[in-house]
């Protein structure tokens, strides 16, 4: 059975099938922007209340659970080893796990399981911080394997590699933006999802210095009119690339106006309709109109905001743009003008690394202590609930079939009752 979900995106409308909307196939969900179209989601829970099941985890991670149908996929660090786990989403039981790589290391909030898997509903692909990239079918059979560091040189990020692949049509788009611990150039590549073959690889040159070339972001997909572009942030700039060739189509500088040598970027670019939102290390967050070519630093700039996030990726529905900083200070901006509608407003004082999710007219914002603040979306600041799992949490929430999936250091939680 199929039903249509109509999303207003500027003046365009897209019909989205239930299959897509009810799954969480990539890090930022079915629409690649932290939004779910689902309704009647849980607002209240605790470690004991409104929990359908929980599965013991061996370690913390920044990777988000990836969900398709009856399967949940997890990038998991277990001591020195990294595995892909496949979990039964109904029972919360481990179905299989496959070895990805040895050589796991921990660096502050980072370990080598930080990249989230991606799936098209038939196969699943997962990257590790050690550079191993593998594809599997849903039974756990390995399709292919790549060692990106062996092929193209050691990663040179100060805190280790953490970018998730972007899956679009027949390919994975993988970025390696680094410079703190290497003189090798940064690059972006397109990999055939069926064979693992590199279809193209392009250098991404910038003038960033010391740690500023390092980027822990994930590529974003920009679609407007008949145009499709891959958006990359890092190295003091944001760029748009032709997915067919990798050619750089446009570039906006200005993400590091003071040429700070420690301006690595963690929060990923956000795309909604024909606008690209590019966070940096707090300021400035830039909003850019799509369609420009060449140097669009000034020509495409719609607005700039001086209180952006460091780690959490923002979320927008095209009308309101929500920012959460690392201390739990929130802003709601007009997505078109950048004007503050509300904020600064502080939610629970803590450190925030998880990215907010927008669904069911609510914002879900989780801090590192495992407390999720649920807020009413829209032009008025209103806290609906605070829900504490009391455990170290870096992962962002995932939503599927009326349930919320939260991954902490100790457990994977399935929250609420399933709605089909």
Whereabouts are the PLM-identified features?
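Noncatalytic, solvent-exposed loop/strand surfaces
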Residues: 20-420
């Amino acid at each position: 059975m199929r039903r249509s979900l109509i999303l207003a995106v500027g003046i365009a409308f897209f019909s989205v099938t239930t299959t897509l909307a009810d799954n969480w196939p990539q890090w930022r969900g079915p629409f690649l922007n932290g939004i779910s179209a689902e309704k009647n989601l849980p607002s209240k829970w605790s470690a004991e209340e409104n929990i359908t099941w929980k599965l013991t985890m061996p370690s913390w991670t920044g990777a988000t659970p990836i969900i398709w149908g009856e399967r949940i996929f997890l990038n998991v660090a277990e001591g020195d080893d990294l595995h892909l786990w496949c979990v039964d989403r109904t029972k919360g039981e481990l179905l299989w796990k496959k070895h990805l790589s040895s050589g796991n290391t921990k660096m502050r909030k980072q370990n080598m399981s930080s990249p989230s898997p991606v799936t098209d509903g038939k196969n699943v692909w997962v990257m590790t911080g050690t550079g191993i990239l593998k594809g599997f079918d849903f039974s756990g059979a390995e399709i292919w394997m790549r060692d990106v560091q062996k092929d193209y040189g050691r990663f040179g990020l100060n805190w280790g590699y953490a970018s998730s692949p972007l899956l679009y049509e027949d390919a994975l788009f993988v970025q390696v933006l680094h410079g703190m611990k290497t003189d090798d150039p940064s690059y972006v590549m397109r990999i055939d999802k069926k064979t693992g073959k590199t279809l193209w690889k392009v250098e991404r040159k910038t003038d960033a210095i010391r740690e500023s070339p390092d980027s822990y972001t994930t590529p974003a997909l920009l679609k407007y009119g008949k145009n499709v572009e891959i958006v990359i942030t890092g190295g003091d700039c944001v760029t748009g690339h032709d997915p067919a060739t990798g050619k750089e189509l446009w570039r906006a500088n200005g993400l590091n106006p003071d040429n700070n040598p420690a301006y690595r970027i963690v929060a990923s670019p956000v795309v909604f309709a024909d606008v690209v939102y590019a966070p940096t290390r707090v300021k400035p967050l830039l909003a850019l109109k799509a369609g420009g070519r060449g140097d669009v630093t000034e020509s495409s700039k719609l607005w700039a905001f001086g209180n952006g996030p460091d780690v959490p990726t923002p979320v927008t529905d095209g009308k309101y743009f929500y920012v959460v900083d690392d201390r739990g200070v929130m802003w709601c901006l007009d997505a078109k003008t950048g004007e503050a509608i509300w904020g600064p407003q502080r939610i629970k004082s803590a450190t925030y690394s998880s990215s907010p999710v927008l669904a069911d007219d609510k914002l879900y914002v989780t801090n590192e202590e495992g407390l999720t603040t649920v807020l009413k979306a829209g032009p008025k600041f209103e806290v609906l609930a605070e829900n504490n799992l009391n455990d170290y949490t870096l992962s962002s929430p995932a939503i599927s079939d009326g349930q919320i999936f939260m991954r902490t250091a100790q457990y994977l939680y399935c929250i609420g009752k399933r709605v089909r």
